[in-house]
Amino acid sequence: TEGLVLRQTKYDEWDKILTIFTRNNGKVQAIAKGARRPKGSLVAGTQVFSYSDLLLYKGRNLYQVNQADIIESFFSLRAYATHIIELIDAGSVEEVPNTKLFDLSIKALKVLSKLNKDYKKLLVAFELKYISFIGYRPHIRSCVVCNNELHNKIRFSIEHGGAICENC
């Protein structure tokens, strides 16, 4: 299954416990045995920010990573990618698939890797889609106070749950 490694924790001498956001199973905890060995076959595909094709087996308490082939790494973008990954981790539930959020996350990281600037615009766009996908959709089509059409100067009101026109 395709997965994005969100977190890793050292476990024993050569192993690590991973939090992986997968397309098919949602967020899962998995053990990657030998993933900390310098020449281990799981090293690259189990790094944080790695988007990998994973062979996972469900154990009693954890999944086990038996194979990890890296599709793409977003390590060089770690400052911005960390923000995206933290949101995914906070907004996903263990073993509850959310393919829309998975696809959005991978797409955002791929676009981020190709940008030279305007990272903040991408992050804001991601955040707006993200909050919609996890069930919080702000009203941005018209003013939440008077329902008039929105023009150039608008403000966002957390209290009202959406955009407010310049007259309100």
Which residues make up each language-model segment?
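Non-catalytic alpha-helical scaffolds and adjoining flexible linkers that form interface surfaces
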Residues: 1-168
